């Protein structure tokens, strides 16, 4: 008799996705981040659910309800900090996952890649709205500044902003709708992640060499289940070290002050994982130009498959492209640092140069490097 996991309609889906899935025999630890993102998402949904049981989305009570969770709810403090720092872990895994895709040419799986970009944008929107919910100073002013960017859209801009606000400023209506969206979006992310996996399993995984691995595939279980469990343990260890020893390391002290529309904080800045995009936004003196650059800094990922000029898929055997990739990583770290600095000399010019470099590397230098490598190998 055939095993039930291969015949049962539901178990068959799980079996083909996580047990009998043929996987390349040589995928490295960079392939662990997909499963880690799944774990992060489940963790965020669970901790978020328990926080929502005690949170009140009213401007007069939001800040107090978060304080109440930390002080009076059983283990409320650990749930709150696991949720806040879980978001940071989520973005670390996301950046690693996208970086892996760029380095090893996984973006040639077009549907998988494009759904991944949509997932990234949805996750960024979710994180932004979540940051508004505690209704601290940085929550309020962050919401005001970022939503205000839409007013740069010609003709309909201001109407659009007031429609999103639900009034003439960030107020009760804004907080309530942000809570509603912040609650529903993770479930949409989960659904999109399933579609992401569906398209991935149509082609099978890429591998570090970029060479088709059909001739040498191994079952996902037990080889990669055990590898993913190791990754999960390291992820949870890192998260709990953050939560239990330095829970406020990545937060902003200003958010421990209740929101006050009459008092602007000296430096308005988002959470660390948005700083690179924030630096690109600030580096352009024109409002509409900055907004366009902000959107393009993420949407440029959609263009990456079109800019692939190399005859090889992966960067494993392409040293010049490797140099370009790591310069891009250094540039993104520079932008992240600049995003957290005040708008003054020399940070302004450093931010502008780093922003120009970011677009230049992706749009010009990487395709040129690939063409040079093709010519060196006489692969016209």
From Swiss-Prot:
PROSITE patterns: CYTB_CTER, CYTB_NTER. One of its GO terms (cellular component) is respiratory chain complex III. It is a multi-pass membrane protein. Keywords: Electron transport, Heme, Iron, Membrane, Metal-binding, Mitochondrion, Mitochondrion inner membrane, Respiratory chain, Transmembrane, Transmembrane helix, Transport, Ubiquinone. GO terms for biological process: mitochondrial electron transport, ubiquinol to cytochrome c. One of its GO terms (molecular function) is ubiquinol-cytochrome-c reductase activity. Heme b b562 binds at residues 83, 182. The keyword Membrane applies. It is found in: Mitochondrion inner membrane. A ubiquinone binds at residue 201. Binds 2 heme b groups non-covalently. The chain crosses the membrane at residues 33-53, 77-98, 113-133, 178-198, 226-246, 288-308, 320-340, 347-367. Heme b b566 binds at residues 97, 196. Its main location: mitochondrion. The cytochrome bc1 complex contains 11 subunits: 3 respiratory subunits (MT-CYB, CYC1 and UQCRFS1), 2 core proteins (UQCRC1 and UQCRC2) and 6 low-molecular weight proteins (UQCRH/QCR6, UQCRB/QCR7, UQCRQ/QCR8, UQCR10/QCR9, UQCR11/QCR10 and a cleavage product of UQCRFS1). This cytochrome bc1 complex then forms a dimer. Belongs to the cytochrome b family. Component of the ubiquinol-cytochrome c reductase complex (complex III or cytochrome b-c1 complex) that is part of the mitochondrial respiratory chain. The b-c1 complex mediates electron transfer from ubiquinol to cytochrome c. Contributes to the generation of a proton gradient across the mitochondrial membrane that is then used for ATP synthesis. Heme 1 (or BL or b562) is low-potential and absorbs at about 562 nm, and heme 2 (or BH or b566) is high-potential and absorbs at about 566 nm. This is Cytochrome b. The gene is MT-CYB.
């Amino acid at each position: 008799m055939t095993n039930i996991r291969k015949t049962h309609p539901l178990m068959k889906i799980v079996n083909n996705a996580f047990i009998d899935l043929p996987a390349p025999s040589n995928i490295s630890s960079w392939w662990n981040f997909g499963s880690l993102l799944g774990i992060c998402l489940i963790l965020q949904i669970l901790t978020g659910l328990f926080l929502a049981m005690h949170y009140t989305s009213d401007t007069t009570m939001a800040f107090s309800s978060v304080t109440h969770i930390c002080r009076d709810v059983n283990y409320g403090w650990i749930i709150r900090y696991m949720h806040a720092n879980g978001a940071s872990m989520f973005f670390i895994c996301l950046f690693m996952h996208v970086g892996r895709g760029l380095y090893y040419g996984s973006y040639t799986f077009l549907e998988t890649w494009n759904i991944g970009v949509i997932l990234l944008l949805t996750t960024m929107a979710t994180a932004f709205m979540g940051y508004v919910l505690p209704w601290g100073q940085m929550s309020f002013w962050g919401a005001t500044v970022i939503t205000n960017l839409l007013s740069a859209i010609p003709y309909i801009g201001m109407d659009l902003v007031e429609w999103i606000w639900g009034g003439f400023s960030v107020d009760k209506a804004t907080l309530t709708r942000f809570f509603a969206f912040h609650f529903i979006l993770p479930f949409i992310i989960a659904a999109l992640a399933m579609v992401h996996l569906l398209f991935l399993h149509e082609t099978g995984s890429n591998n570090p060499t970029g060479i088709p691995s059909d001739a040498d595939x191994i079952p996902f279980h037990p080889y990669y289940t055990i590898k993913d469990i190791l990754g999960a343990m390291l992820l949870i260890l890192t998260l709990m070290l953050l939560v239990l020893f330095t829970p406020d390391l990545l937060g902003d002290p200003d958010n421990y002050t209740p929101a006050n529309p009459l008092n602007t904080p000296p430096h308005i800045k988002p959470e660390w994982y948005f700083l690179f995009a924030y630096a690109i936004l600030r580096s352009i003196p024109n409002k509409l130009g900055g907004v366009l650059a902000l959107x393009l800094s993420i949407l440029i990922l959609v263009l990456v498959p079109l800019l692939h000029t190399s005859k090889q898929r992966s960067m494993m055997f392409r040293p010049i492209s490797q140099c370009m990739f790591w310069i891009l990583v250094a540039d993104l770290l520079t932008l992240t640092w600049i995003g957290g600095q005040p708008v003054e000399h020399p940070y302004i010019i450093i931010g502008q140069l780093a922003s120009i470099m970011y677009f230049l590397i992706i749009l010009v230098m990487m395709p040129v490097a690939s063409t040079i490598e093709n010519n060196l190998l006489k692969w016209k």
